[in-house]
Regions:
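Residues at alpha-helix termini
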Residues: 7, 30, 136-137, 175
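Conserved PLP phosphate-binding loop immediately N-terminal to the Schiff-base lysine helix
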Residues: 1, 8-45
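Active-site C-terminal subdomain of aminotransferase-like
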Residues: 28, 34-148, 153-158
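Terminal amphipathic helices with adjacent charged low-complexity linkers/tails
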Residues: 137-168, 173-188
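Charged, low-complexity surface patches
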Residues: 16-17, 123, 161
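Generic non-transmembrane alpha-helix signal with a bias for helix starts/N-cap capping motifs
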Residues: 20, 116, 127, 164-166
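Alpha-helical scaffolding segments of alpha/beta enzyme cores, especially the outer helices
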Residues: 2-6, 129, 167
């Protein structure tokens, strides 16, 4: 991160998948200046059916004045609205997807520090267990340990049995399981 910062750059952490590191490390300590978190992936908020989703953004203090405003600010145990000096202003009508963010906060408070510390470890453990089971039927795209997610490829099933990723996804839904992302490009 120091090389980027020395060149005048900023580091952005795509916290869409914090699952594997939650409770174990903090992106800000790794040198990242801006972090977003898709709450539905890590903190048990709804996302199905197109939303409502929520992706709060956290920044280092030197970027605070550039955040969209207004921001709730706590001064002397009283909350007020604060409009950052260099803000582009409001990004969303009213208060955004406030209830989704509140639900994530309640989930984190219920887990507590100890529960949050276990959250990442369990995400990795669950993904590795599931990948070992899935790989008995559908080969994994990569032969290496996964963290909180893995990619399976039905390329061979398509050739041998004309079964597509879409078919597997629909079969999972029929059995009551949420279908994973299908047709994920393996070049990512």
């Amino acid at each position: 991160s120091q090389i980027i910062h020395n060149a005048g750059g900023l580091l952005y952490y795509d916290g869409a998948n914090l699952n594997a590191i939650v409770g174990a490390s903090r992106p800000g300590d790794m040198g990242f200046d801006i972090v977003h978190s898709n709450l539905h992936k890590t903190f048990a908020t709804p996302h199905g059916g197109g939303g409502p989703g929520s992706g709060p953004v956290a920044v280092k203090s030197f970027l605070r004045e550039y955040l969209p405003g207004p921001i709730a600010e706590n001064k002397d145990r009283k909350y007020n609205w604060y409009q950052p000096e260099n803000s582009i202003g409001r990004m969303h009508g009213y208060h955004g997807n406030f209830l989704v963010t509140l639900r994530a906060l309640v989930y984190m408070k219920l887990l507590g520090k100890e529960g949050l510390d276990k959250l990442g470890a369990y995400a990795v453990l669950n993904a590795r267990y599931l990948s070992s089971k899935v790989s008995q039927i559908i080969p994994l795209a990569y032969d290496e340990p996964c963290m909180h997610e893995f990619v399976a490829s039905v390329k061979d099933l398509k050739k041998s049995h004309k079964i597509k990723a879409y078919d597997v996804g629909k079969a999972l839904l029929d059995k009551g399981f949420h279908s994973p992302t299908i047709y994920f490009p393996l070049i990512v």
